[in-house]
């Protein structure tokens, strides 16, 4: 969720609402389940994420806060749908990096470099 929250915050959206929605979605079947999925089919590795997102690109802070305006320009002024795709990809990329760390050196080694 760190990557997701970062993009949501940078674009002036409500990260608390996104967090609540995603966590509710992850537990929709009575137990907490993964938001990301992976498979290998016909030699092709597929990694995807399913999350509920309701994000905006107009109104609110998008036209008022200079850093939000900059973030939206940096992202080439995406539509709401495109922004949701960007946010999901950020989350997926972060999850993929975490899986790599877990299957190689471990999460702790990477975090210890920060201290």
Set out the residue ranges of the language-model regions.
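Catalytic-core signal marking the mid-to-C-terminal active-site face
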Residues: 37-115
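Glycine-rich anion/phosphate-binding loop at the beta-strand->alpha-helix junction
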Residues: 1-67
């Amino acid at each position: 969720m760190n990557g997701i929250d970062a993009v949501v915050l940078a674009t002036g959206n409500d990260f608390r609402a996104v967090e609540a929605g995603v966590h509710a979605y992850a537990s929709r079947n009575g137990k907490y389940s993964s938001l990301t999925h992976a498979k290998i089919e016909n030699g092709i590795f597929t990694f995807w994420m399913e999350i509920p997102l309701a994000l905006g690109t107009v109104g609110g802070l998008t036209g008022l806060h200079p850093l939000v305006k900059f973030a939206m320009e940096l992202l080439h002024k995406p539509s709401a749908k495109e922004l949701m795709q960007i946010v999901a990809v950020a989350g997926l990329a972060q999850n993929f990096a975490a899986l790599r760390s877990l299957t190689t050196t471990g999460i702790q080694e990477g975090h210890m470099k920060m201290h």
